[in-house]
A protein has these predicted regions:
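Short Lys/Arg-enriched helix C-cap and helix-to-coil transition segments
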Residues: 137-144
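Histidine- and aromatic-rich ligand-binding microenvironments
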Residues: 103, 134-137
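Major-groove recognition helix of helix-turn-helix-like DNA-binding domains
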Residues: 99, 123-132
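Short amphipathic alpha-helical/adjacent loop interface patches that line ligand
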Residues: 66, 130, 158
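Basic nucleic-acid-binding alpha-helical/helix-turn surface characteristic of O6-alkylguanine DNA
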Residues: 1-121, 167, 171-175
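Active-site phosphate/pyrophosphate- and oxyanion-stabilizing loops and adjacent acidic/basic residues
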Residues: 44, 127, 162
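…primarily DNA-binding HTH/wHTH and HhH modules…
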Residues: 147-175
Length: 175
């Protein structure tokens, strides 16, 4: 099959590590950490579903995303307004939609997320959907922590998750 579309990608250097930003059309479809062991899977899924190839380039939405990330890391942005293209299963999109309702400076457990989407026994599935998030930070999966307040897995690594939560003023957790 010949790819008919192009996913434009460029590197972004954050204070927490290198990321790849990607856009398809006028929407951001990728914001992944280079340390993400599932990152290649996300790229393959995007290429297959969008019938597109990856191309190192930039776009208006990528530059807007980079500018908003700069503001976020400088402590001047709490909410993002970059248009997103979320590619995943219906369940994943439900979880990601609920993640976007978790405000800056707040955390939830995976169990709380499962309850919020009406699937209280689907804690593991929620964790898996969280881990499959193709647009980290914009869909704030870093705000989900263990029920014991531990920092559990994160595509950018536990250190990046800790630094993001410190930036948002919620780490260490005050019990």
């Amino acid at each position: 099959m010949i790819a008919r579309g192009v996913i434009k990608t460029r590197l972004y250097e954050s204070p927490c590590g290198t990321m790849t930003l990607g856009s398809f059309g006028d929407k951001l479809c990728l914001c992944k950490w280079h340390t993400d062991k599932h990152g290649e899977l996300a790229c393959r899924r995007l290429k297959r579903i969008l019938n597109a190839c990856l191309e190192e380039d930039t776009s208006g939405v990528i530059e807007k995303a980079a500018a908003q990330l700069n503001e976020f890391f400088a402590g001047r942005r709490r909410v993002f307004d970059v248009p997103l293209l979320l590619i995943g299963t219906d369940f994943q999109k439900t979880v990601w939609g609920e993640l976007m309702n978790v405000p800056f400076g707040k955390t939830l457990s995976y169990g709380e997320m499962a309850r919020r989407i009406g699937r209280p026994k689907a804690v593991r599935a929620v964790a898996n959907a969280n881990g499959a998030n193709p647009v980290c930070i914009f869909v704030p999966c870093h705000r989900i922590i263990g029920s014991d307040h531990s920092l559990t897995g994160y595509a950018g690594g536990i250190d990046a998750k800790r630094r993001l939560l410190e930036l948002e003023g919620v780490w260490p957790i005050k019990i």
